[in-house]
Amino acid sequence: MQTALLKPKIIAVEPLGDHHAKVVMEPFERGYGHTLGNALRRVLLSSMVGYAPTEVTIAGVVHEYSTIDGVQEDVVNLLLNLKGVVFKLHNRDEVTVSLRKEGEGVVTAADIELPHDVEIINPGHVIASLSAGGKLDMQIKVEQGRGYVPGNVRKFGDESSKVIGRIVLDASFAPVRRVSYAVESARVEQRTDLDKLVMNIETNGVISPEEAIRQSARILVDQLSVFAALEGTESAAEAAAARAPQIDPILLRPVDDLELTVRSANCLKAENIYYIGDLIQRTENELLKTPNLGRKSLNEIKEVLASRGLTLGMKLENWPPAGLEK
């Protein structure tokens, strides 16, 4: 009897327009089309990385309910138009860009001054219309993120740093605009009870529909991998011990193993420095404050440590380890 689950062998991508495609996957076992289609759809809409304007400062504007002389749109509509600009950042998480224009005419996304590693997908997008004598001067902060983040959630954590006139925007980072899926019948040899998953995906151009599917699948695999590795419930202490960095065995050895002079060794023990791990965490200034330990003894300690690849002033996590005797 056949017990192995079928995996899709046919994956077809049919372009339907700019940044719009239909992705077909088959065959799936019965019921898997809806199971995977719904999971992929939710991840595509909520968890993909994108970019959005998050803060704006406009010259002469104190709050979003203002108007600007010579600009046909009020500030609320101007900000709504600005949210429609699709940014793409390369090798950075945030950037502040400028928009300066004056004189009669239409202001588009192409008028935004960009550094070399920032791209605008829709440069023809209209932001505002200026009349004769109109002037628009804006600073726009663009950030990387996931999903939708309301402005009141990400408002200034430190109110003292708030700049008068800085407007915080609701940010829609999601690069996937629309996703729908359908499950149709598929057939393999004599089996006719299989599923075909058809996904219709439209993005804003920051990512292609095919790449969006790949990334969403990776996210699901990553989230579910913890269940595949599940071997039972471990105690909190065991979990913490497993996460703790391993300590170099040389640090657990007593300072006597350094074969220091009697004077230096006695000075260290008087300061409760029993192990090499205790010693390397002390600084030169701290050791020089030790009674009867002078510059000569300090140099001796430094030379002995250097011969073992160690120095003073090192930082150790989880020191001392549990069970270390003093």
Curated annotation (Swiss-Prot):
E.C. number: 2.7.7.6
Cellular compartments per GO CC: cytoplasm; DNA-directed RNA polymerase complex
GO terms under biological process: DNA-templated transcription
GO-annotated molecular function: DNA binding; DNA-directed RNA polymerase activity; protein dimerization activity
Catalysed reactions, semicolon-separated: RNA(n) + a ribonucleoside 5'-triphosphate = RNA(n+1) + diphosphate
InterPro entries noted in UniProt: DNA-dir_RNA_pol_insert, DNA-dir_RNA_pol_RpoA/D/Rpb3, DNA-dir_RpoA, RBP11-like, RNAP_asu_C, RNApol_insert_sf
Enzyme class: transferase
Pfam family, one: RNA_pol_A_bac
Region Alpha C-terminal domain (alpha-CTD), annotated ranges: 247-326
Region (Alpha N-terminal domain (alpha-NTD)), start-end ranges: 1-231
Alphabetic keyword roster: DNA-directed RNA polymerase, Nucleotidyltransferase, Transcription, Transferase
Lineage top rank: taxon: Bacteria
Transmembrane segments: none
Quaternary structure (record): Homodimer. The RNAP catalytic core consists of 2 alpha, 1 beta, 1 beta' and 1 omega subunit. When a sigma factor is associated with the core the holoenzyme is formed, which can initiate transcription.
Similarity-based family: Belongs to the RNA polymerase alpha chain family.
Function summary: DNA-dependent RNA polymerase catalyzes the transcription of DNA into RNA using the four ribonucleoside triphosphates as substrates.
Cross-referenced NCBIfam families: PRK05182.1-2, PRK05182.2-5, rpoA
Domain notes: The N-terminal domain is essential for RNAP assembly and basal transcription, whereas the C-terminal domain is involved in interaction with transcriptional regulators and with upstream promoter elements.
Protein name: DNA-directed RNA polymerase subunit alpha
Gene: rpoA
